[in-house]
Amino acid sequence: MAGSIFKQEVMKVTGRSWEEWIVALGQEVGPLWSHKQIRNHIVEQHQVSGEWGEWIAVMYEQIMGRVPVGVSKDAGVQIGVRKTMAVTKERVWDFLMSSEGLSLWIGDVPSLELQVGHEYESKEGVSGKITVVVPYHKLRLTWKRKEWDNPSRLQIYVLSTNTGKTTIAIHQEMLDDVYMREIMRRYWDEMLTTLQSQVIAPK
């Protein structure tokens, strides 16, 4: 339930291991407590920030048997992000696959060979393998940061709208935990905002 990166971060931020948090909260938290009660207890009794009170509460609630948003039986922990922009889907796709576009979501790679089975790795350590290619529509691949224990599954869709605009949809599955889900939600939101600015107003 808790990935290695979350465990490292909670130790760094709070000075207490995740295993120690589980023991402490197991002694303090009632089984019928609401999410808000658990979060407020963590913040007030353990002197952690509101953000980390939220994370620890969400992660602990999974141990209590509660299922957080963004978790499914088949796809594990997942996140979906999308943005619509006033450009053609061909323009968006071509930019995504250019070295400039690739730098936004894979890193420094000279090119990406759009062939099923092609393996890639950027200088920053993002690596994976392409599993599905439908040019100017869909790309499916594995996607793993160098510090991750396991790869995620990434799908990128480029879709034309009825108004002549283009929606780019990103769906990422098999993330370690809901903490990483939020990290990646922020990452893809920022990536799409940057992509939109560069596609609509290129340098």
Language-model regions, residue ranges each:
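Eukaryotic low-complexity, mixed-charge intrinsically disordered interaction/regulatory segments enriched
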Residues: A2-H41
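Juxtamembrane/disordered regions of integral membrane proteins
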Residues: T14, E20, E54-W55, M85, ...
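Hydrophobic ligand-binding cavity/cleft-lining segments
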Residues: H41-S111
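Short, surface-exposed coil-to-beta transition loops
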Residues: G80, K123-S127, D149-Q155
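Hydrophobic pocket/interface hotspot
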Residues: V92-W93, L102, I130, L141, ...
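Glycine-rich portal/gate segments that line the openings of hydrophobic small-molecule binding cavities
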Residues: M97-E147
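Beta-strand/loop substructures that line and gate deep hydrophobic ligand-binding cavities in soluble
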Residues: K146-L195
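Short, highly charged C-terminal tails/helix-capping segments
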Residues: S197-K203
